[in-house]
């Protein structure tokens, strides 16, 4: 891609995200989301491959439908109440349609079918942007309108997402699809806690962004997109591979790693809100996700593929990829647990 075009696309991607997040008017928020969608499509199609074109088309159609529903919801609310403010979403129909529109943009179940297919057709770098940066604006809008939303609807969407996210990743062999279902499951945890404690949703979102970014950076460093190629990662970058298993276990929510902290707090909060059945179901659904994370960990650490004697020497050559960001991300995604007691006070 032309450097000038690339800089314009990245600037639009960043600025319109901030417009959508900081706006208090529905029309401006919708405009920010729309331009943000249009800005990422050139990044999706920069590799001229049929899968990339198909992924960008699916993404555009899904996001266009979600944006149309969001605009309908805000127009309906403005027609009935005379208010365009995001904080004045009072009509029940508008609240329900707005929730569905934002969940469709995020890829929450049962509106999740586009996410694994789109992510599979993208490069790891674009997939990283789609799985992290593109979640910020819809989550910020959800955070603002959380008090007005229908709690049973949110809990149903959250529980469905955690179950489908865990169940869908069990039989996958493509790493990008596994990360897509992982994203769906994590978003389900966030939506489930949103009606009770929006602050915990922000904590969960922050740790999810760190862990997912780390995993995408690791996969980009070792050039792996399939489970079968993970077994050769030891010969490429031994130290990165050793730390990546901690990231995988952290994504699975095992203590005392970073991913355990938000799940612990969420279950504690749900139990205190007398929703013990929901908390138990969420905890059991996390076992589904943990299974395929453990499978990836087993392949990375305890298996080795047949290779020549020269293959074991590739790590001796200096890598040309910058690793400072990856090093920081690996530490944050694995060892943020020492600061967790401070969040209890």
UniProtKB/Swiss-Prot annotation:
InterPro entries: Complex_I_Subunit_2, NADH_DH_su2_C, NADH_UbQ_OxRdtase_chain2, ND/Mrp_TM. GO terms for cellular component: mitochondrial inner membrane; respiratory chain complex I. GO terms for molecular function: NADH dehydrogenase (ubiquinone) activity. Pfam families: NADH_dehy_S2_C (PF06444), Proton_antipo_M (PF00361). The chain crosses the membrane at residues 25-45, 60-80, 99-119, 149-171, 178-198, 199-219, 242-262, 282-302, 324-344. It comes from the Eukaryota. It is an enzyme of class 7 (translocase). It is found in: Mitochondrion inner membrane. It catalyses: a ubiquinone + NADH + 5 H(+)(in) = a ubiquinol + NAD(+) + 4 H(+)(out). Its EC number is 7.1.1.2. GO terms for biological process: mitochondrial electron transport, NADH to ubiquinone; mitochondrial respiratory chain complex I assembly. It is a multi-pass membrane protein. Keywords: Electron transport, Membrane, Mitochondrion, Mitochondrion inner membrane, NAD, Respiratory chain, Translocase, Transmembrane, Transmembrane helix, Transport, Ubiquinone. Core subunit of respiratory chain NADH dehydrogenase (Complex I) which is composed of 45 different subunits. Core subunit of the mitochondrial membrane respiratory chain NADH dehydrogenase (Complex I) which catalyzes electron transfer from NADH through the respiratory chain, using ubiquinone as an electron acceptor. Essential for the catalytic activity and assembly of complex I. Belongs to the complex I subunit 2 family. This is NADH-ubiquinone oxidoreductase chain 2. It comes from Xenopus laevis (African clawed frog). The lineage of its organism: Eukaryota, Metazoa, Chordata, Craniata, Vertebrata.
């Amino acid at each position: 891609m032309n450097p000038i075009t690339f800089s314009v696309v990245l600037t639009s991607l960043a600025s319109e995200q901030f417009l959508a997040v900081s706006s208090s008017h529905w029309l401006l928020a919708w405009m920010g989301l729309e331009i943000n969608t249009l800005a990422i499509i050139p990044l999706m199609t920069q590799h001229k491959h049929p899968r990339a074109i198909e992924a960008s088309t699916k993404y555009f159609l899904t996001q266009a439908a979600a944006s149309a529903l969001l605009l309908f919801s805000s127009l309906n609310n403005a027609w009935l109440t005379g208010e365009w403010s995001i904080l004045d979403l009072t009509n029940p129909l508008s609240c329900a349609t707005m929730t569905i529109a934002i969940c469709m943009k995020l890829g929450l179940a049962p509106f999740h079918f586009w996410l694994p297919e789109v992510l599979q057709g993208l490069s790891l770098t674009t997939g990283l942007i789609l799985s992290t940066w593109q979640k910020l604006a819809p989550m910020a809008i959800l955070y603002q309108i959380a008090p007005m939303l229908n709690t049973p609807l949110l809990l149903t969407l959250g529980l469905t997402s955690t179950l489908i996210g865990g169940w869908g990743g069990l039989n996958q062999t493509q790493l990008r699809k596994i990360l897509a279902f992982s994203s769906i499951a994590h978003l389900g945890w966030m939506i489930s806690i949103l009606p009770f404690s929006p602050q915990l949703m922000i904590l969960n979102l922050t740790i999810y962004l760190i862990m997912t970014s780390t995993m995408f950076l690791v996969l980009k460093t070792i050039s792996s997109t399939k489970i079968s190629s993970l077994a050769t990662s030891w010969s490429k970058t031994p130290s990165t591979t050793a730390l990546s298993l901690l990231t995988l276990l952290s994504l699975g929510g095992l203590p005392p790693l970073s991913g355990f902290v938000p799940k612990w707090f969420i279950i504690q909060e749900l139990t205190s809100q007398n929703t013990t059945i929901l908390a138990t179901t969420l905890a059991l659904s996390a076992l589904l996700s943990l299974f395929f994370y453990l499978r990836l960990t087993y392949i990375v650490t305890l298996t080795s593929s047949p290779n020549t004697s020269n293959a074991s020497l590739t790590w001796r050559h200096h890598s040309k990829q910058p690793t400072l960001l990856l090093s920081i991300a690996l530490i944050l995604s694995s060892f943020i647990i020492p600061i967790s007691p401070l969040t209890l006070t």
